[in-house]
């Protein structure tokens, strides 16, 4: 009798264990500070995730959306926008924007209306602005009710979005060689002005009322300072493949291949090379990049199939922390 029962019990045990792996227990998160990381995942694989590093950089929590909600985030976490109350996670290939409580990361709402491969988002004046990969428009939603408000027509599809008190700046699609920054009046939500630059736009950031735009071609990279529609300053970096333009305090940062650079926002001085993140594919090694409080965050996507690394440096290139996160870490956002 025992010889008959034991295989049955063993089989039941194995079946139970394998099923329990598919069950996801929701956890109560209590996030009050730190940094969010969007892990893109693999295209068509539904394995995008979000990670969180605490404020003193001592602890990492992976897959916080799944932990908080008992379900996966979706397919390709492209970017996010963070407000005092909510985090808007743009999930490109799922055609969703997951709205979550900033503290608990519990899902509040899933925006789907009008979305067609959403890319980047910014919140201004109580409105959420969203760019689309293939459509020459920016979508506008109410940032509290999440209702669709309107579509703002552009000349070309846009990528990154930033905002100051006057405009939302929409940079033309980087991958199609766009050279146009289109300005949306934040009061009227109309495309009122355009600024044409000299090369393909490959970076966009804002500090106060000044918007900084990086462009590049095969041989040179440039940074422009825009105040409204006026180009107030520009510099030729004399470097190829400038990317990842970021601002922290009184400095601008960017990457070129595997090197990290710093430059004064006046753009009156030359860029200072800080350090190299290593040898190899600079695009993968700095797939994600941002700077907070003097700490330089890099997202190493590796082979874009296995889990990636977040490597945090000081300006002198000394290592602060290294963490294993999700697949293809592509962005860092302050709590």
Task: Give the label of every model feature segment.
Residues 1-35:
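Bacterial Sec-dependent N-terminal signal peptides
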Residues 35-45, 89-93, 130-134, 170-176, ...:
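Conserved beta-strand positions in repeat-built beta-propeller and related beta-rich domains
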Residues 44-51, 96-99, 137-139, 176-183, ...:
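Structural motif
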Residues 55-56, 101-105, 142-146, 185-189, ...:
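Short loop/turn segments that connect beta-strands within beta-propeller blades
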Residues 64-73, 110-115, 151-155, 194-199, ...:
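Surface loop/turn motifs at the tips and blade-to-blade linkers of beta-strand repeat domains
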Residues 74-79, 116-123, 156-165, 199-208, ...:
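Repeated scaffold domains used in trafficking and secretory/extracellular systems
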Residues 148-235:
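Solenoidal tandem-repeat scaffolds enriched in leucines and small polar residues
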Residues 233-305:
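Intrinsically disordered, low-complexity segments enriched in Gly and acidic/Ser/Thr residues
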């Amino acid at each position: 009798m025992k010889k008959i029962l034991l295989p049955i019990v063993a089989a039941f045990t194995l079946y139970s264990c394998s099923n329990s792996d598919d069950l996801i227990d929701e956890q109560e998160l209590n996030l009050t500070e730190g940094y969010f990381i969007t892990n893109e995942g693999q295209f068509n694989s539904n394995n995008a995730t979000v990670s969180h590093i605490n404020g003193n950089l001592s602890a990492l929590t992976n897959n916080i959306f799944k932990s908080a909600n008992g379900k996966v985030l979706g397919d390709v976490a492209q970017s996010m926008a963070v407000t005092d109350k909510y985090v808007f996670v743009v999930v490109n290939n799922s055609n969703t924007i997951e709205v979550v409580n900033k503290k608990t990361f519990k899902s509040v709402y899933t925006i789907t209306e009008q979305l067609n491969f959403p890319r980047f988002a910014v919140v201004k004046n109580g409105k959420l602005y969203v760019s689309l990969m293939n459509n020459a428009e920016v979508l506008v939603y109410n940032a509290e009710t999440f209702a669709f408000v309107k579509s703002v027509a552009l000349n070309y599809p846009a990528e990154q979005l930033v905002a100051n008190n006057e405009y939302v700046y929409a940079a033309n699609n980087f991958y199609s060689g766009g050279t146009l920054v289109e300005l949306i009046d934040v009061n009227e939500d109309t495309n009122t002005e355009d600024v044409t630059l000299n090369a393909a736009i490959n970076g966009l950031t804002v500090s106060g009322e000044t918007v900084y735009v990086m462009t590049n071609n095969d041989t040179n990279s440039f940074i422009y300072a825009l105040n409204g529609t006026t180009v107030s300053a520009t510099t030729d970096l004399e470097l190829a493949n400038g990317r990842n333009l970021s601002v922290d305090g009184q400095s601008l940062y960017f990457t070129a291949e595997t090197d990290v650079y710093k430059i004064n926002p006046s753009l009156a001085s030359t860029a200072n090379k800080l350090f190299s993140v290593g040898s190899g594919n600079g695009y993968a090694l700095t797939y994600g990049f941002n700077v907070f409080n003097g700490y330089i965050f890099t997202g190493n996507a590796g082979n874009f199939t296995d889990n990636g690394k977040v490597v945090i440096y000081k300006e002198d290139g000394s290592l602060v922390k290294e963490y294993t996160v999700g697949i293809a870490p592509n962005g860092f956002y302050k709590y």
